Amino acid sequence: MAVVMDGVKKNIIDRTIPNLVKKFQNFNNDDIAYFLKLLHETGIDLFEINRDSMDKIKKFPLNLDYIYRIENIEDYNYLNNYNFKYIILNYKTIYRFLLEDEKIQKNLKEHNIILEIDIEDLDELYLSEDNKIFCIFNIVCLRINNLSKLDFIDEDFRIKDLKSKFNVLVDFCASNKYNMATAIIINAFLNGSDIITTEFNSNDYAAMEEVIIALKSIRNIEIRGDLKLISKLTRIYEKITSERVYSMKPILGEDIFKYESGIHADGIAKNPKNYEPFNPELIGTNRKLYIGKHSGKAALVVKFKELNLNCNNIDMNLFLQDIREKSIQEKRNVLDNEIIEMYKEYNKSYQR
C-alpha cells in the first residue's frame, strides 16, 4: 500500500495507537487487530507504536510494518523482541544513547532510524558542524515535528536541501495547534515529502482520513488502498473507544451527507458536485435525504423516487402539507417507513 504521485511512491505513517493507549485503559486485542488491518487495507503503510502500546496491547498483527519509538533505556528493552521496520529517536535525546554501553550502541546501529526533530531545532541541526549522529547511526529519515503553521519558507527548496545535506528521506508530522495540520501535511506531500505522519480521527495531528480524501478528491492522487473501508474504520474505532465520532466530523461524521431543504435536495438531485466535495460512495457510505418541516415539493419528489413511490397517484401539495404537520407534531423528521404508510393511506382514500 502507498500513495503515488507523478509515478513516485510515498508512504503514510499512522500514529493512532499510542494516543489511544494514552487516553484509554482497556482494549480488546481482536478489535485492535481489525482496526489496524482496515487501516492497512485503506492505504496505510507503517504503524507507529511505543512501549505503552506494547504493554497494553498484547497481540499485534504480524503481517504489518511497525515503527517503534524509543525515548529511554526502558523502551530499549523491547527492541530485541520484535522485528521493527524503523525505530524513532528524538534529536534531543539521541545523544544520551552515546553514553550507554557499547552493546546498546551497537544494537541501535543495526536498525534503520527515523530521527525526529522539532521545527524550532532544525536550524541548530543545520548549523552544527559536528553531526556525528549521522555517522554513528543509520539515520534513513528525518521527521520534521510540531510544524503548526504554513510558514516553512520555500518548502520545496527546504525539503530538497534536507534530502541533499543529510542524505535522508523526509517525513512531516504536523501539530494541529492552529487547526492547520491537514493543510500542512498536504502541502508537504505535494512539495516533496517522502513520508507523512497522520492519525485517525485526530484533533492533535493531521487527520488521516482528511489527508487521503483531499489528495484523492482534489488532486486525484493515486491511493493504493480501499477508501470504502473508511466507514468500517469509523465503526470499529467507536467500538474501541466507546465514544461516538462527532456527527459532523469531516469525512467520518454520520450526518455529513444528510440533507433536507428543498433547494438543497433539488440541487443534489441535479448535480451532487454543487454541494458535495466528493461522492459518499468513495468512503463506503451514502447520502441521506430527510423529509421534514423544511422540505419542499422537489425534495418530496426525490424521496418518492428513492422509495419507489408513484407521485402521480396523489395530490403532492396536500401530502407535503401533512408531512410538515407530522414533522412539527413529532418534533423530528418524518421517517421513510412513516412516509410509506402515509402514502398507502392516501392511496386507499383515493380508491374509495
Swiss-Prot record:
Gene3D superfamilies for the chain: 1.10.238.260
A family per Pfam: HCS_D2
Keywords: Nitrogen fixation, Transferase
Catalytic activity reported: acetyl-CoA + 2-oxoglutarate + H2O = (2R)-homocitrate + CoA + H(+)
GO function terms (MF aspect): homocitrate synthase activity
Enzyme Commission number(s) of this protein: 2.3.3.14
Keyword Ribonucleoprotein found: no
Biological process according to GO: nitrogen fixation
Transferase is among the record's keywords: yes
PANTHER family: HOMOCITRATE SYNTHASE, ISOPROPYLMALATE_HOMOCITRATE_CITRAMALATE SYNTHASE FAMILY PROTEIN
Family: Belongs to the alpha-IPM synthase/homocitrate synthase family.
UniProt function note: This protein is a Fe-Mo-cofactor biosynthetic component.
Quaternary structure annotation from Swiss-Prot or TrEMBL: Heterodimer of an alpha and an omega chain.
Extra remark beyond the main annotation: In Clostridium pasteurianum the N-terminal and C-terminal portions of NifV are encoded by two different genes, nifV-alpha and nifV-omega.
Protein name as catalogued: Homocitrate synthase, omega subunit
Species of the source: Clostridium pasteurianum
